[in-house]
UniProtKB/Swiss-Prot annotation:
Chain ranges passing through the membrane: 10-30, 42-62, 82-102, 109-129, 139-159, 163-183, 201-221, 224-244, 257-277, 288-308
Free-text function comment from the UniProt entry: Catalyzes the proton-dependent uptake of 2-keto-3-deoxygluconate (KDG) into the cell.
Any Pfam family matching the protein: KdgT
GO cellular component, one term: plasma membrane
Superkingdom of origin: Bacteria
Family affiliation: Belongs to the KdgT transporter family.
Natural source organism: Xanthomonas oryzae pv. oryzae (strain MAFF 311018)
One function term, GO molecular function aspect: 2-keto-3-deoxygluconate:proton symporter activity
Compartments in which it is found: Cell inner membrane
Keywords annotated in UniProt: Cell inner membrane, Cell membrane, Membrane, Sugar transport, Symport, Transmembrane, Transmembrane helix, Transport
Catalytic reactions on record: 2-dehydro-3-deoxy-D-gluconate(in) + H(+)(in) = 2-dehydro-3-deoxy-D-gluconate(out) + H(+)(out)
Lineage of the species this protein comes from: Bacteria, Pseudomonadati, Pseudomonadota, Gammaproteobacteria, Lysobacterales
Protein name stated in the entry: 2-keto-3-deoxygluconate permease
InterPro entries reported for this sequence: 2keto-3dGluconate_permease, 2keto-3dGluconate_permease_sub
Length: 318
């Protein structure tokens, strides 16, 4: 049976399919973890420890050595995306309930969902698109994008916009696994290669654990909102990223469009933030479902828009 190939036909399928299976498990048997206990409970409820290992392994993949051009390109994209997410948080904070919109076409939409969907780029998708449409420097920009992994950037944005206050030790705790992995990966190339293999392996496991925090009714109710959020991510972050790539990064805008996606790992952000800032707990389930939808929408649309932008750039040069 070609289960893996079938699952991967869906954009982000290795994370989203286990997430849906987890949501199905939680809907049909909410007490499964506590009833089964032991290792089964660890798989069902172990979102944080599984993600901690994943962040460590992601940190190990970040190489310290990078050319000035690569740092310039990646820095302009990463900083622009973070700045846009912060601006969206500042503008929307007075307009949206902290627990999310309760009903209507924007059901579940909250500042937490917006920040989580906008501040983290799908690095794998970006690298693949740049290998096809960009240069080696463009593809190398994924180096700094790995720093967006985890809740740290979202914590900084929510804190800077006045929506939450986090104790200093929480920032340290959020980034420490990434830094430890980063240190080991740069001290020993063999360790970097060893830990890098686990980054893909762990994805379905944290997807399943995350799904076990959701009810299928939440996913159904936020379906339309999730599609709109995915489109909003591309529109709101895409144009600034395109301009930043041209004016700051020295590119033709193609890399900027390719970076206007939502990372699969962003699905974990609402639950992690809610664990540290309880005021976001009511918004977290809907935000998780919304971000999952945004991952699918951006994974489908961003490659198409990147191809169009690359074609326009070639015509302009020609």
């Amino acid at each position: 049976m070609r289960i893996k190939a079938t699952v991967e036909r869906l954009p982000g399928g290795m994370m989203l399919v286990p997430l849906l299976l987890g949501a199905l498990c939680h809907t049909l048997w909410p007490q499964a973890g506590s009833t089964l206990g032991s290792f089964s409970n660890g798989l069902i409820s172990g979102t944080v420890p599984i993600l901690a290992v994943w962040f460590f392994c992601m940190g190990a993949t970040i190489q310290l050595r990078a050319s000035g051009r690569v740092l310039r390109r990646s820095g302009s994209l990463v900083l622009t995306k973070i700045a846009v997410a912060w601006l969206v948080a500042v503008v929307c904070a007075p307009l949206l309930p902290i627990g999310g919109i309760p009903s209507g076409p924007l059901t579940g939409l909250s500042v937490l969902a917006l920040v989580a969907a906008m501040d983290m780029t799908n690095g794998g998708l970006y690298a693949a698109l740049m290998q096809q449409y960009g240069s080696s420097e463009d593809a190398g920009a994924v180096v700094l994008m790995s720093l967006e992994s985890g809740p740290l950037i979202s914590m900084l944005i929510l804190g800077a916009s006045g929506l939450a206050t986090f104790e200093p030790q929480l920032f340290v705790g959020a980034v420490l696994p990434l830094l430890l992995g980063f240190a080991l990966g740069n001290l020993d190339a063999q360790l970097r290669q060893f830990f890098a293999q686990a980054t893909q392996t762990l994805v379905p496991f944290f997807g399943f654990a995350l799904g076990n925090t959701l009810d299928l009714s939440t996913i159904v109710h936020t379906g339309a909102s999730g599609v709109l959020l995915g489109v909003a991510v591309i529109v709101i972050t895409g144009l600034p990223l395109l301009l930043a790539d041209r004016w700051l990064g020295g590119g033709d805008g193609t890399a900027g469009v390719a970076a206007s996606s939502t990372a699969g790992a962003a699905v974990a952000t609402p639950a992690l933030i809610a664990g540290m800032a309880p005021q976001f707990a009511p918004a977290a389930p809907a935000a998780t479902a919304l971000v999952a939808s945004a991952v699918i929408v951006t994974s489908v649309l961003v490659p198409l828009l990147t191809a169009l932008q690359a074609g326009r750039s070639r015509q302009r040069i020609g």
